């Protein structure tokens, strides 16, 4: 699909950057000659806009070998960022998709500034080509034909091999994010814990990773009472899924991803209202993020050891379901008083974290659609983070800045720990109250990370979008897939 060339050839469409300071770049000047001065007229009359994310289409009318030019406004260079570029190109690729373009080129060097080099631009272009044109996988009987971009050429004077490598990495990041989106969008009667485990096994086998899928009996032997409690009411068997990627000869410096895999959450006996229940098929967004990251890792083969652990079940009501006031024993040996069966994700993750440590994780990053409280605190565009290790958090933060997936750190104070430890009957309680809900959930998980460096990522607000946006349609976003993979790719760098 991807090609790199030094000279512009015949294409259906060519994408060109327009900055406010460079309305008459060398390329535009040359092209204007072919258009007999008409481009300059369009610029002067503002028919070609330099405004951020403005897309101006110009037909060549046979004056060049290119059928149509798409000029992408990027505003002033001083305010040009990777986020601006991602949004602008995402919108552009959506426009090309709507026009059913199959052969497009991007004038890569027109997007290069002192802030962003050609490799950065190539990576982002290939990434958002996939993200921006992603479509929901539906179950409608009337299937519409989709015209795909078959040929995408980067025009640049830079080294072709380096640009090809950047295009490949960007493409893999975009495709894996879309894989995660598809998982989150699947209905709960299709994506059960068993089906999620089957998907994970297929992924592991494709990329020659080791894997384990623990069944209920094995979980009982290991004392995974927290996950098993959540599963008590279900007819669907639980799964504890583990993928093991060995990027080094020695099993050291192991990064452990733990993704919440609740395939549907009714709230249990702490039942959600109807409005709060619809959409809870997406409560396995953390699991999807982890699997998406493992897809990237499998493709790119970084020299880093990684474990991905996914505790998976649904949380439903029945005569056997767990109840408020139950006391359960987690794999760690710590006992938990259940005050809220709708705070089930942290119970599943507690055993997932302990199991990741058992498998050898030296660093822990858990990802979960955990609390509505994080949405109240940070909205729908920022992931909440908590940590017991600032050095590890800084690496996660840097990765998120590279991928434009914003995160914000929330605190853990001793008084927060006292609240989750406040129980007359057990070591911990699973829900101290509504105040500081997002912080309480993260603090609870920290009790199981203990001294292992750990970062908690609450993606309840960022896992799905209520409306279409420049990087995709309404629905699942694939939040944190690219950040987790970038963390692994950059881990330990100075």
Curated annotation (Swiss-Prot):
Stated role: Presumably involved in the processing and regular turnover of intracellular proteins. Catalyzes the removal of unsubstituted N-terminal amino acids from various peptides.
Gene responsible for this protein: pepA
Catalytic reaction equation(s): Release of an N-terminal amino acid, Xaa-|-Yaa-, in which Xaa is preferably Leu, but may be other amino acids including Pro although not Arg or Lys, and Yaa may be Pro. Amino acid amides and methyl esters are also readily hydrolyzed, but rates on arylamides are exceedingly low; Release of an N-terminal amino acid, preferentially leucine, but not glutamic or aspartic acids
Main EC class the enzyme belongs to: hydrolase
Main location (coarse class): cytoplasm
HAMAP family listed in its UniProt record: Cytosol_peptidase_M17
InterPro entries (UniProt xref): Leucine_aapep/pepB (IPR011356), Macro_dom-like (IPR043472), Peptidase_M17_C (IPR000819), Peptidase_M17_leu_NH2_pept (IPR023042), Peptidase_M17_N (IPR008283)
UniProt protein name: Probable cytosol aminopeptidase
The organism of origin for this protein: Bacillus cereus (strain ZK / E33L)
Keyword tRNA processing: no
Keywords attached to this entry: Aminopeptidase, Cytoplasm, Hydrolase, Manganese, Metal-binding, Protease
A cellular component term, taken from the record's GO annotations: cytoplasm
């Amino acid at each position: 699909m991807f090609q790199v060339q030094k000279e512009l050839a015949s294409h259906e469409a060519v994408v060109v950057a327009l900055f406010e300071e460079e309305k008459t770049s060398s390329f535009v000047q040359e092209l204007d000659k072919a258009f007999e001065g008409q481009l300059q007229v369009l610029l002067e009359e503002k028919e070609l806009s330099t405004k951020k994310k403005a897309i101006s289409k110009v037909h060549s009318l046979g004056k060049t070998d290119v059928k149509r030019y798409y000029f992408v406004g990027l505003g002033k260079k001083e305010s040009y960022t990777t986020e601006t570029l991602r949004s602008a190109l995402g919108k552009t690729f959506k426009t090309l998709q709507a026009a059913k373009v199959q052969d497009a080129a991007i004038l890569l060097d027109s997007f290069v500034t002192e802030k962003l080099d050609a490799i950065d631009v190539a990576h982002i272009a290939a990434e958002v080509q996939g993200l921006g044109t992603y479509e929901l996988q539906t179950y409608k009987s009337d299937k519409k034909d989709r015209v795909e971009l078959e040929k995408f050429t980067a025009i640049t004077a830079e080294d072709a091999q380096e640009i090809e490598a950047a295009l490949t990495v960007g493409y893999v990041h975009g495709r894996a994010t879309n894989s995660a989106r598809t998982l989150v969008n699947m209905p709960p009667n299709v994506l059960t814990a068993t089906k999620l485990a089957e998907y994970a096994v297929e992924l592991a086998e494709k990329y020659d990773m080791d894997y384990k899928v623990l069944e209920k009996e094995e979980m009982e032997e290991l004392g995974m009472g927290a996950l098993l409690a959540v599963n008590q009411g279900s007819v669907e068997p639980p799964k504890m899924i583990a993928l093991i990627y060995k990027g080094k000869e020695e099993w050291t410096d192991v990064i452990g991803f733990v993704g919440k895999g609740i395939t549907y959450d009714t709230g249990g006996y702490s039942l959600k209202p109807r409005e709060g229940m619809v959409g809870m098929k997406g409560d396995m967004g953390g699991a999807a993020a982890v699997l998406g990251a493992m897809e990237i890792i499998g493709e790119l083969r970084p020299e880093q050891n990684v474990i991905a652990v996914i505790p998976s079940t649904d949380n439903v009501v029945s005569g056997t379901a767990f109840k408020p006031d139950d006391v359960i024993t987690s794999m760690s040996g710590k006992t938990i008083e259940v005050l809220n069966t709708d705070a089930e994700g942290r119970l599943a993750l507690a055993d997932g974290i302990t199991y990741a440590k058992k498998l050898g994780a030296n660093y822990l990053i858990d990802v979960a659609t955990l609390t509505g409280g994080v949405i109240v605190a940070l909205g729908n565009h920022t992931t909440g983070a908590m940590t017991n290790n600032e050095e590890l958090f800084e690496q996660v933060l840097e990765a998120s800045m590279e991928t434009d997936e914003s995160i914000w750190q929330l605190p853990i104070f001793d008084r927060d720990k006292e609240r989750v430890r406040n129980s007359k009957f057990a070591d911990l309680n699973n829900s101290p109250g509504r105040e500081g809900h997002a912080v309480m959930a993260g603090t609870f998980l920290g009790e199981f990370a203990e001294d292992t460096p750990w970062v908690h990522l609450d993606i309840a607000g960022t896992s799905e979008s209520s409306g279409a946006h420049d990087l995709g349609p309404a629905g699942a976003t694939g939040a944190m897939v690219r950040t987790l993979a970038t963390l692994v790719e950059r881990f330990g760098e100075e």
